C-alpha cells in the first residue's frame, strides 16, 4: 500500500505467544501477502512496519515479533517497554500454547500496564484438531479482546489491527478504506466453518467471567 497522505501516528505493537502459533505468519500476510508454509523459530525479534489506510487517515503500526521460546525469556522485558498495544497468539490445535496465554498476559501487564490487547486463537481452519475447551473472555473486565483467526485462510487477519487502532485512536467507527496486500487463501474457510467458530466463541463469552489470574485454561 502506498498512501497518498502523511502518516498521522506511529504505534508500537508487541506480538507475543508460544513459538509456532503463527505470529510471523500473521505479520507476513499483511506485509507481503505471503503465507509461510515452513516455520522457522524467530531469533530474538523482528520489527515490521505495517501501514493501514483508514477513514481517519494513515497509521503505522511497528510490529515487534518476539521469539516465543522459553530460552529467550530473559530478553522479553526489554522488548515490552514502551509498547502501546499487543497481540497474544495461541494455536487452537495446541493445548500447550493455549495454557500459556495467562503467563504471557501476566508478563505483558507487569511491564506495560493496561494497554489494549487482542488475544488471537489462530488456525481455526483446523477444526477437527481443536483442543481448547473454553474462551478466554477478558474484554468485559479488562482492556482485552478475544478473536478467532486463520492466517492460512485469511479469516479475520485484519480484525486485530482494526480493533487496536480503534482503541489507540479513540474512535470506534474507524474502518479500513484500503485493505493491505493479501494473497488468496491457501485453504477455503467456508461459511459453515465460520458459523461453527462464531458459535463456539459466542458460547464462551456467555459464560460467567472468571478472575483473570485464576482461569483454568
Swiss-Prot record:
GO cellular component assignments: cytoplasm; nucleus
The subcellular localization recorded is:
Cytoplasm; Nucleus
Q: Does the keyword Nucleus apply?
A: yes
Sorted alphabetically, which keywords does the UniProt record give?
Cytoplasm, GTP-binding, Nucleotide-binding, Nucleus, Protein transport, Transport
State the Gene Ontology terms under molecular function.
GTP binding; GTPase activity
Query: Which Pfam families has this protein been placed in?
Result: Ras
Positions bound to GTP: 18-25, 36-42, 68, 122-125, 150-152
What Gene3D superfamilies is this protein classified in?
P-loop containing nucleotide triphosphate hydrolases
Which superkingdom does the taxonomy of this entry point to?
A: Eukaryota
Name all Small GTPase Ran-type domain ranges. 7-171
Record-level GO BP terms:
protein export from nucleus; protein import into nucleus; ribosomal subunit export from nucleus
What SMART domains does this protein's entry cite?
A: RAB (SM00175), RAN (SM00176), RAS (SM00173), RHO (SM00174)
InterPro entries recorded: P-loop_NTPase, Ran_GTPase, Small_GTP-bd, Small_GTPase
Give me the ranges of the annotated region Switch-I: 37-45
- Identify the stretch(es) annotated as Switch-II: 68-84
Q: Assembly and interactions?
A: Found in a nuclear export complex with RanGTP, exportin and pre-miRNA. Interacts with tamo.
Protein purpose: GTP-binding protein involved in nucleocytoplasmic transport. Required for the import of protein into the nucleus and also for RNA export.
According to its UniProt record, which protein family does this protein belong to?
Belongs to the small GTPase superfamily. Ran family.
Q: What is this protein called?
A: GTP-binding nuclear protein Ran-like
Organism, by scientific name, is Drosophila melanogaster (Fruit fly)
Amino acid at each position: 500500500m502506498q498512501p497518498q497522505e502523511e502518516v498521522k501516528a506511529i504505534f508500537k505493537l508487541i506480538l507475543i505467544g508460544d513459538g509456532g502459533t503463527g505470529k510471523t505468519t500473521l505479520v507476513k500476510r499483511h506485509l507481503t501477502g505471503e503465507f509461510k508454509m515452513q516455520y522457522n523459530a524467530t531469533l530474538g525479534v523482528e520489527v515490521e512496519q505495517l501501514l493501514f489506510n483508514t477513514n481517519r487517515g494513515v497509521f503505522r503500526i511497528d510490529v515487534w515479533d518476539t521469539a516465543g521460546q522459553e530460552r529467550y525469556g530473559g530478553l522479553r522485558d526489554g522488548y515490552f517497554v514502551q509498547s502501546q498495544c499487543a497481540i497474544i497468539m495461541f494455536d487452537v490445535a495446541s493445548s500447550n500454547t493455549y495454557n500459556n496465554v495467562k503467563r504471557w498476559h501476566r508478563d505483558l501487564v507487569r511491564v506495560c500496564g493496561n494497554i489494549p490487547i487482542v488475544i488471537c486463537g489462530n488456525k481455526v481452519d483446523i477444526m477437527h484438531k481443536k483442543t481448547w475447551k473454553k474462551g478466554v473472555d477478558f474484554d468485559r473486565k479488562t482492556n482485552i479482546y478475544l478473536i478467532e483467526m486463520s492466517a492460512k485462510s485469511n479469516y479475520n487477519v485484519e480484525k486485530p489491527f482494526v480493533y487496536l487502532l480503534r482503541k489507540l485512536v479513540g474512535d470506534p467507527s474507524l474502518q479500513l478504506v484500503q485493505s493491505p496486500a493479501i494473497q488468496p487463501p491457501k485453504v477455503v474457510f467456508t461459511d459453515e466453518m465460520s458459523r461453527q467458530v462464531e458459535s463456539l466463541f459466542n458460547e464462551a463469552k456467555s459464560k460467567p467471567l472468571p478472575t483473570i489470574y485464576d482461569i483454568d485454561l
